[in-house]
Each structure stands twice: as structure tokens, then as C-alpha cells.
Amino acid sequence: MKKKALAVLVNDVHLDKSNGDLVKDIFRQLIQVCEDFKTNRIICGGDIFTNRSAQPMICLTDWKDILDMLRKAGVCLDVIPGNHDKTDPDDERSYLDVYSYPEVILHRKGESCIIGGHVFVFVPYFTDEKWLEEFQKADEIRESQFAEGDVEEDACSFLITHSGFDGVKNNDGSEVKSIIKPSMFSEYTKVLIGH
């Protein structure tokens, strides 16, 4: 017997004009994982799209098809914009703003939400300075959710974000230097990062 999950996480889908069928298949599999683990929620940690400057029509319609698939399956999608979903890194707006579905919860700025009795902090991609501002706002809300008894003392705190933190190694082996330090997240149960 499989355990009940709070959500299923996916990051960095990178939908482009050549991989629509593959990405649709990934979401079909995610829906099946949701069914298997008795959840109706997918969390996407950014980069639905690949192109920063413009989206080909096929990408826009493929994403709409995926959202229709999620709706039909009764699956909710929490999503944050990644760097590939924006034209301006410090703008809250992204290509994801053009899709208005009740099942899609777009976290455009730092937010703290209670899901299944646990706290989820969502911080989209921004430049480091703006990211810190958004994180601090969301973290204050998280702290107040615990202080005001909105969640149990032993509830987990999850950070879902799209950023490069200090000390992270890139695929090319280079190391990220950033004002965002891992030590800032000591109160979090898990920090789940896309980029």
C-alpha cells in the first residue's frame, strides 16, 4: 500500500517547439503518480518554457493542452515562474500569467501557503537582491503561521524556489557565488530548488 503524498514535484520542464509530445507524456505520468500516491496536487518549481524572449505558438497551445489534461484529471498545479518563464528577472509577470485556470495557482511573488497541514514557501526566480526581499516576506508569513497556531508545532516547512544559491555547482563544474546562503534555511525541513 502506497503512502498518501502531499504533492508531486516537477522542475525545469523546458517545453519548446520540439518536445511537446514528450512533455505531455511527462504530465500524463505525473497524473498517474498523483493517483498512485493519493494526491491531487503537482508543484512545479519553475521553467515551464525554454525561450525567454518569445514563445512559439505550439508551446503555448501545448501548455494549454497540458492544463486541460490536469483539469480533466482533477489535479491542481502550484507553479512558480523560473528564469526561462520571464523576460525580466525582477518582474512578477511571466508567460504563465496568460493562463487562467481555477486549478492553477500561480505564485508570482514570495508566498507561504498551508497544504495538508504543512507550510510551503514559494519563491519564484528573481535577481538575488529581489529574491531575498521576496523570501524574507514569505518567511515572515511562515513564522506567523506557526506563531498563530495555523499549523501544528511539528509541521514541516518546505521551500520551493528557482535560484542558484552560494556554493551550488553548475553542470559545467563552476561554483555559484551568491548572497543567498544555505545557512538561511535551517528552519526548513526541505529546500527544493529548480534552475
Region locations from a protein language model:
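Structural motif
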Residues: 5-7, 40-41, 118-119, 156-158, ...
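Core catalytic region of metal-dependent phosphoesterases/phosphodiesterases
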Residues: 3-6, 13-113, 184-188
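Conserved catalytic scaffold of divalent metal-dependent phosphoesterases
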Residues: 85-183
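Mobile, glycine- and charge-enriched loop segments
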Residues: 1-23, 144-145, 151-164
